[in-house]
A protein has these predicted regions:
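A bilobed periplasmic-binding-protein/Venus flytrap-type ligand-binding module shared by bacterial periplasmic
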Residues: 165-172, 207-211, 287-300, 318-321
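N-terminal secretory signal peptides
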Residues: 1-29, 44, 52
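Early extracytoplasmic/lumenal segment of secretory-pathway proteins
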Residues: 54-118
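Conserved C-terminal helix/tail region of periplasmic/extracytoplasmic solute-binding proteins
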Residues: 248, 351-384
Length: 384
């Protein structure tokens, strides 16, 4: 098994496209060449902009926000300049940057919601007024997403999400072939399975395969069974790599199956590559990003205005089909604004029954209490 690179949140690591470079034009060029933006650094020009907080907002975000036209409407309508830094590290690193930087360095960040409860507990992010945001336009299940609420108070809002299930080459496999994770263990696909190097989604999906409805809340026996499943899967896996490595390998025909979802498949399919994705009968796990405001920002008014924009339909309809990677979006008005083919590709065609049909078999990705043991099991799997 080839392990190319440790990758902390694969749906947004190492796929960031610089719109000012020759790789910024199309996703097809990205697949052909690969792309990565380095982890954020606090440059002097960025720090100097903090002084003009009354007319600006400082944002640390994962990829997509930097693409042309994403933030233009916000800046033109509000007169607020967005000082944007794209983050290519982990959620923990993003939150630590907000926590350890001087107040106002970052007014807004966009971590995975699984990290919001600890950020609330540590006093890093500010409480939000639900009435300030278009939650009535959201899918109900996302508006009430448990990790962003605590004791009836709102601290963050999901504005981008998706799922992990199976991404597959539909010229080689039918939908019925991949309706169960059993396909990953079929001897005929030995060495043809690729995995993204991030333990939570891979182990979460395999935990669902083992029959655990709450895939990250396992007792000792269930966790032992999960390790057995990992051991069984190991000979089937030919590649563990970062996002660009896996996508390029699949696009080149080297691999046919991956534990992944629309954030990988939709863009490749749109570019004419033969990949589809689905949630197997055993279920899958979600990924998401949630916007939140620093508890120490001196610039909360502008930060809230920014959150209002990125939770609204105009922005989300663009973010859904960002060149960086596609995603589902929770604002139903944004879904309606998408072309019909994009809505179908992103499972947003039937928005009235989205909660009860599509989301019913997905479990929120979370950080398990015995996280270190999970990480150790994943490292052992990779090195076997």
């Amino acid at each position: 098994m080839e392990t190319l690179m440790n990758n902390d949140n694969p749906q947004y690591k190492n796929v960031l496209i610089n719109p000012n470079s020759q790789l910024g034009g199309t996703r097809r060029k990205f697949i052909a060449h690969g792309a990565a933006i380095g982890a954020v650094s606090l440059s002097a020009p960025f720090i100097s902009k903090i002084a003009s907080a009354s007319t600006s907002v400082n944002v640390l975000a994962f990829g997509g926000y930097e693409e042309p036209g994403m933030l233009t409407e916000f800046e033109e309508k509000t007169g607020i300049t967005v000082n944007l830094k794209i983050h290519d590290g982990s959620d923990e690193e993003m939150i630590a940057l907000m926590e350890t930087s001087s107040p106002g360095t970052f007014d807004v960040i966009t971590p995975t919601s699984a990290y919001i409860p600890k950020a609330i507990e540590d006093g890093i992010i500010a409480e939000l007024n639900p009435a300030d945001f278009p939650l009535d336009d959201y899918f109900d299940i996302i508006a009430k997403w448990p990790p962003v609420w605590k004791t009836g108070k709102l601290y963050a809002i999901v504005n981008r999400f998706g799922y992990y299930g199976i991404t597959y080459n539909h010229k080689k496999f039918s939908e019925s072939d991949v309706s169960s994770y059993d396909i990953l263990f079929d001897p005929s696909v030995k060495g043809r399975v690729a995995l993204f190097d991030w333990f939570l989604p891979n182990m979460g999906c395999l935990s669902k395969y083992n029959g655990n409805p709450n895939p990250y809340d396992l007792d000792a026996a269930a966790f032992s069974d999960l390790n057995d499943t990992l051991t069984k899967l190991r000979p089937q896996v030919g590649l563990v790599g970062n996002t660009s490595q896996v996508i390029q390998a699949m696009a080149g025909g080297s691999y046919d199956l991956a534990i992944a979802g629309e954030w990988v498949q939709a863009g490749m399919y749109d570019d004419g590559l033969p990949f589809k994705a689905l949630v197997p009968e055993q279920g899958g796990v979600t990924w998401d990003q949630a916007v939140c405001v620093s508890a120490t920002t001196p610039n909360k008014e502008n930060a809230v205005k920014f959150l209002q924009y990125v939770t609204g339909p105009a922005f989300q309809s663009k973010l859904a089909i960002a060149k960086t990677y596609y995603s589902m979006v929770p604002n139903k008005k944004a879904a309606v604004m998408l072309p019909n083919d994009k809505r179908e590709l992103l499972n947003l065609s039937n928005i009235e029954k989205f909660d009860e049909i599509f989301m019913s078999n997905l479990s929120p990705r979370k950080s398990p209490d015995n996280r270190d043991e999970w990480m150790a099991s994943w490292e052992q799997f990779k090195n076997a």
